[in-house]
């Protein structure tokens, strides 16, 4: 037998390049693309507040819908799909669907990411991961073993990506966190590169993709670009091949593709998020119209935000 068929032989784990001191020059065309995407996100954010009003009680439910849309899309990237009914039951702890429970855990991860966005340190990322894999042995813990992506679960030989050795993970994460603390890059560029580096490090035994995408939202919020969740993962989901190819290119030293993918996904998220806001506002208007003539203190009015 060959070494590959036996799953034995030499392999090379990734040693990620340090980011904290690297200078990233964003070419003019890409800078314009990113600026356009960021403008779209800001416009969506403003539209949500204007359409419903910054203090409108429906903005809370709308934020929840957007957050769940992002969480479900991020989970779907990992082949975890679930219907709305099962997701609702899982949130009430009444679903037997493992996928539904996983998506609810992703919602909790996103909630933690947004709650901790102002101070993204290692503890914050471990907390996000602990929410995602709650109840498992590895929840909220950096891995202590080698992990890889693709081919066989038994051996790293022939894998698409072999993550850094476990002993190199703490230092790689500290470098990433120092990079995240910088303030000299466009937010979307910053988040895209941080995400790709996180996926390169693969700091956990499981849940790296979902935690890494939650990290993106923590940065978009913490750095002041967004106050409402835009379903960026829904945009990534429309072209998974390009997303995974961009991550591979980043590991090879080319950051441009992953920045381009996040710019594209951000524009999609802005359009999708705006549509969701408009749909909710329209539905509320229709429901109020149906209640015309019903006295203001009737129980039916309490159902509407």
Kindly give the residue locations of the regions a language model identified.
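FIC/Doc superfamily catalytic core
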Residues: 1-305
């Amino acid at each position: 037998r060959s070494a590959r068929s036996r799953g034995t032989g030499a392999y090379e784990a990734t040693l990620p390049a340090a980011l904290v001191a690297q200078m990233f020059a964003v070419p003019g065309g890409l800078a314009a693309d990113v600026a356009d995407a960021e403008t779209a996100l800001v416009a969506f954010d403003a539209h949500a507040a204007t359409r419903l009003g910054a203090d409108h009680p429906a903005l809370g439910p709308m934020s929840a819908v957007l957050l769940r849309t992002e969480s479900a899309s991020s989970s779907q990237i990992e082949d975890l799909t679930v219907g709305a009914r099962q997701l609702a039951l899982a949130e009430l702890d009444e679903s037997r669907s493992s996928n539904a429970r996983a998506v609810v855990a992703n919602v909790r991860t996103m909630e933690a990411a947004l709650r901790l966005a102002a101070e993204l340190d290692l503890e914050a990322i471990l907390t996000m991961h602990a929410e995602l894999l709650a109840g498992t042995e590895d929840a909220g813990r950096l891995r202590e073993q080698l992990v890889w992506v693709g081919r066989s679960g038994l051996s790293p030989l022939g894998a698409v990506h072999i993550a850094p050795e476990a002993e190199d993970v703490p230092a790689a994460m500290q470098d990433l966190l120092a990079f995240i603390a910088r303030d000299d890059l466009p937010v979307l560029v910053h988040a895209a590169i941080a995400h790709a580096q996180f996926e390169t490090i693969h700091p956990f035994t499981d849940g790296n993709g979902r935690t890494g995408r939650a990290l993106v939202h923590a940065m978009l919020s913490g750095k002041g670009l967004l106050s409402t969740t835009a379903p960026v993962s829904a945009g990534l989901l429309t072209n998974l091949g390009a997303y995974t190819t961009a991550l591979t290119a980043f590991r090879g030293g080319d950051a441009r593709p992953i920045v381009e993918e996040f710019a594209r996904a951000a524009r999609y998220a802005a359009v999708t998020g705006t549509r969701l806001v408009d749909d909710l506002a329209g539905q509320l208007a229709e429901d109020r119209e149906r209640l015309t003539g019903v006295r203001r203190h009737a129980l039916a009015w309490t159902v509407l935000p």
